[in-house]
Amino acid sequence: KEGSLTKIQGKGTFISRNKTVYPFDHGQGFTYSCQLRGVVPSTRVLNLDYVIPTEEDRLFFQLKEKEKVLMIQRLRLGDDKPCILETLFFPMTFSSLCEESLDVSLYSLLKEKYHIQPVKGHKWIEICKVTPFEAQMMQAQPGDAMLLMHEMVTDQFKKPLHTSKMIFSP
């Protein structure tokens, strides 16, 4: 994409810090993508917690200060290899997700059990350097560069559904 790289004479070409924003395309998630490619998807739930959201997420969910959100952190694997480290944030109206089996497609679960479908939103992509924890999960080295995607997704009723942060293996 134009403007994604910066060339500095005598130093090299670098990835710019500009974020590219893309429209959300109806939520065909990881499980579906794997199935299309003949890859066996699996998921390990790493963490469930109630956390104070970032200011950006708080505004998206229209929360008051100090209101918490549900955080779900999962490692998505394809043929048993780490593909995505995802951290999702849901408003407390979805706190019952804690009682569900979260090693399945969340979009399928939301559709089948809660009659909720991801419809619109936006995402932006940037490059990040992984932390020691992220590196361990992704079988990489701390500081390695990986693709980081953020999403803000609304449902069919135009209500905020979730935000997410996903780190993709190269």
Q: What residue ranges belong to the model's regions?
A:
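N-terminal helix-turn-helix
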Residues: K1-I15
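All-alpha effector-binding/dimerization core of bacterial HTH-type transcriptional repressors
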Residues: R17-P170
